[in-house]
Amino acid sequence: MCGITGIFGTADRSALGAMTDSLRHRGPDDEGRYLGKLTGMGHRRLSIIGIDNGAQPIRGDRRDVYVVANCEIYNYRQLRDDLRRQGHHFRTDSDAEVIVHLYEEYGDRCVEHLQGMFAFAVADGDRLLLARDRFGIKPLHYAEVGASLLFASEVKALLQSRLLTPQIDEEALADTAVFGHPAGPGTLLRGVVSLPPGHTLSAVLADDRLVTAVTRYHTLPEAESDPKPFAEAAADLTELLRATVRSHLMAEVEIGVTLSGGLDSTILARLMRDLHDGPIRAYTIGDHADHPDVVQARRLAAQLGLNHHVSILTFQDFVATIPSYLTAAEQPAGLGGIALNVLCRRIGDDVKVCLNGEGADEVFGGYGEYVNRSFRTRRMVDRLAALEASGRPVSRRGREYLDSLTADQPFPHYLRKLFAENMREQLTRDHLELLDASSMAASLEMRVPFLDHHVVEFAFRQPLAYRVDWELGITKRLLKQAVLKTWGDEVDLVGSVLRRKIGAPTSVLGHRERFIRLCDQVLPADYLRDDEYGAYFEQKSDLLVFNLYQEIFVRCRGVLPDGFTMLDFMAQQARRPALSVAG
């Protein structure tokens, strides 16, 4: 797992160097660069497969085709064997090398052959191809600057090129105030775009003008396109998950697992126990030792014989982590993600690779909104009305999204749209981008077996009622049945199935509420009213976090200044000499 950067249209050596250096945390093991006539590409490497000879960029059989990739390709051995039979010559043991040979063989359709998570760039003479995996597990951002295209794994790398000026996109900010993220592929910075999941981007120069085309290569299957009897579907799902976890254990380094005590992480830990002979490290975080997540995780770890590590997050550490968390997240994200950020640093002390249960809620229907259509949309409607009344409308894409979910329609129609929308945007923007940001900030690769495309497509081909029983209010019905049929005699595993979903990350809810109260106490009464962006926010704490985001990304181009602390920033915003917190 790695970080990639590049410039197409002009191979600016200085800008490429600054961009690549800014991603050192994503790849502390090695660095490589390629400079062609029109394309410059950089790579920072975290060595996991092909440790001894997997340096990038990697050249294909043709001398003008190069690839840089941030990837884990789980079927690379089979692909490599097939490509060798077709006459291709491999120079490394890296999984990334199959991409450049697939491109030489199949062109842009090379992505259709890949099982895994990836974001990559192929330089092909005077043409560039960018690609992102089907569900956006790996990030890829780009910006058009004149006749050049900049791309990178992180926004801060684009800013460090010094070729574009960071400016807030107020329409994207309005979207974020309503939905929690910009609607569509845009970001909070004007002109900076995230390549959508399941898409490629091609770029060429025509008469010194940049010409780009974004193309979708993956769509979700229709519900009930390959239905099975419910019991058979549950049994097939268990075997599919077993095969998927086996493929995700591929590495030349030790692999851990996050363990929250909930259903998703429990399944992964249980399958790892079946498939892995050696010791397994499991990691849990909570705000105190008696937190329900910690207690349940301890039970499971003891039953499965895991080497269990528990991190306790204090309020003082919570507050102190906010600046580095936002620097990694590259968005004024909800502070609930701080627990994961801290946990990733702890995991990164021990291992380079970890399995995580992200994606199971979106694939199998794990949120309250899957059984109650107003669970989430009620607040969105209220926020949208407030913003429009103040002359700050959301984007057309944001309005279409909300209209599609609030329309008067039978519940199955609503549910079908919800699954599709959540897989398209919420999963990527609210979860996967933050998971990647926090893990890679700790030089840690997080793997998400529930988002293997075989698992996702299997689930989506089954009837909606298999995943969610909206009449009885049962979420993740198929996934729960798979666990009960397979491990129904294991008490603590059954406990994870029957346990009421209390919502992640519960481990920091108390700290977050305490931080909100602290902001209300120390920030001026007119803090929201007097700020040019105050109308976008409901609470002082939210505006404070946004202003911190501006400090880091607009003023400092994604680089957190040395010695910068959250308490100093709060004191500055509060116009007070100093602040301190306990606990």
Residue ranges: model-predicted function:
Residues A235-G256, R346-D350, Q426-L434, I552, ...:
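Phosphate/ATP-binding catalytic cores across multiple sugar-kinase/actin-like superfamilies
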Residues R63, S94-A96, I168, L237, ...:
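A generic structural signal for residues located within well-ordered alpha-helices
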Residues A289-C344, G348-D350, E369-R379, D408-L415, ...:
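ATP-dependent adenylate-handling ligase core
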Residues M1-A328, L340:
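Cysteine-centered catalytic environments shared across enzyme families
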Residues M1-I4, Q160, R190-P196, L210, ...:
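Adenosyl-5′-phosphate
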Residues V351-D361, G365-Y367:
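Short acidic/histidine-rich active-site segments
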Residues H89-D93, D287, R378-L387, K501:
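A conserved active-site-flanking secondary-structure segment within enzyme catalytic domains
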